[in-house]
Amino acid sequence: MVVMNSLRVILQASPGKLLWRKFQIPRFMPARPCSLYTCTYKTRNRALHPLWESVDLVPGGDRQSPINIRWRDSVYDPGLKPLTISYDPATCLHVWNNGYSFLVEFEDSTDKSVIKGGPLEHNYRLKQFHFHWGAIDAWGSEHTVDSKCFPAELHLVHWNAVRFENFEDAALEENGLAVIGVFLKLGKHHKELQKLVDTLPSIKHKDALVEFGSFDPSCLMPTCPDYWTYSGSLTTPPLSESVTWIIKKQPVEVDHDQLEQFRTLLFTSEGEKEKRMVDNFRPLQPLMNRTVRSSFRHDYVLNVQAKPKPATSQATP
């Protein structure tokens, strides 16, 4: 999940250093080839993405994200309510390249675009949505299901406006954020997504921004109401454990050409050496002692087309 620029000032001013807990990938889950411009640590003499350079040490909390969701280990919770989504297309403001993903931001001073229900006690206002994707269609999602990953993952980021005065405060506190995760899989052309894809040539470079009004992101949601939920963190600095994750079970279909347009974006500003914006996902984190709850019974069959994680790493352009 991408953190807003306004959090960078908070992060840089944060006192003290937090402990690092080394992430270890289980042997049965070989590592995906994550771009070292986006990962949390340095290897093979590759530089970190600038987003991570202001972090002295990565916090070693026990509620970090993303995770691998084990279908049969998730616990059905009959008390989970249906998730209610109400977005006002008029609150959509613009789309911009922040050097890590592209974000579509929304006006959030009122409750015009909110979610409620599900595992949430309060209304949460929509702040922005963005995507994570891979260099090829075999991987790209941050979360995985039974060790399978998807070509891309959509994150719709909301904040608790009942308990907090602004997004920046909510992003640093427990139960401050609610993020809906939606997997993207290869399939038919997505007509509504294409409206967004058509803007991408205008924001190829970092910091480019264009107006993008009257868009309802619920058109990017699957029709199936089923979801998993767990307590986790931001997947970019400051990695605060402030997120209630709501991961939709059913993916949405997009075609290969639409994903290829994502890959035309750049991490870099105009005039700098070009670095393709691909593999902008964080490595999987340990589940630790957390429980992943589901809103559906386990007699469902996983009706998704996903790629198994590759057994060997490949270099990213």
From Swiss-Prot:
<dbReference type="Pfam" id="PF00194">
    <property type="entry name" value="Carb_anhydrase"/>
</dbReference>
<feature type="transit peptide" description="Mitochondrion">
    <location>
        <begin position="1"/>
        <end position="33"/>
    </location>
</feature>
<dbReference type="GO" id="GO:0004089">
    <property type="term" value="F:carbonate dehydratase activity"/>
</dbReference>
<dbReference type="GO" id="GO:0005737">
    <property type="term" value="C:cytoplasm"/>
</dbReference>
<comment type="similarity">
    <text>Belongs to the alpha-carbonic anhydrase family.</text>
</comment>
<dbReference type="InterPro" id="IPR023561">
    <property type="entry name" value="Carbonic_anhydrase_a-class"/>
</dbReference>
<dbReference type="InterPro" id="IPR001148">
    <property type="entry name" value="CA_dom"/>
</dbReference>
<keyword id="KW-0479">Metal-binding</keyword>
<keyword id="KW-0809">Transit peptide</keyword>
<dbReference type="InterPro" id="IPR018338">
    <property type="entry name" value="Carbonic_anhydrase_a-class_CS"/>
</dbReference>
<keyword id="KW-0496">Mitochondrion</keyword>
<keyword id="KW-0456">Lyase</keyword>
<dbReference type="GO" id="GO:0005759">
    <property type="term" value="C:mitochondrial matrix"/>
</dbReference>
<feature type="binding site">
    <location>
        <position position="130"/>
    </location>
    <ligand>
        <name>Zn(2+)</name>
    </ligand>
</feature>
<feature type="binding site">
    <location>
        <position position="155"/>
    </location>
    <ligand>
        <name>Zn(2+)</name>
    </ligand>
</feature>
<comment type="function">
    <text>Mitochondrial carbonic anhydrase that catalyzes the reversible conversion of carbon dioxide to bicarbonate/HCO3.</text>
</comment>
<feature type="binding site">
    <location>
        <begin position="235"/>
        <end position="236"/>
    </location>
    <ligand>
        <name>substrate</name>
    </ligand>
</feature>
<feature type="domain" description="Alpha-carbonic anhydrase">
    <location>
        <begin position="37"/>
        <end position="296"/>
    </location>
</feature>
<protein>
    <recommendedName>
        <fullName>Carbonic anhydrase 5B, mitochondrial</fullName>
        <ecNumber>4.2.1.1</ecNumber>
    </recommendedName>
</protein>
<keyword id="KW-0862">Zinc</keyword>
<dbReference type="GO" id="GO:0009617">
    <property type="term" value="P:response to bacterium"/>
</dbReference>
<feature type="binding site">
    <location>
        <position position="132"/>
    </location>
    <ligand>
        <name>Zn(2+)</name>
    </ligand>
</feature>
<dbReference type="GO" id="GO:0005739">
    <property type="term" value="C:mitochondrion"/>
</dbReference>
<dbReference type="InterPro" id="IPR036398">
    <property type="entry name" value="CA_dom_sf"/>
</dbReference>
<dbReference type="GO" id="GO:0008270">
    <property type="term" value="F:zinc ion binding"/>
</dbReference>
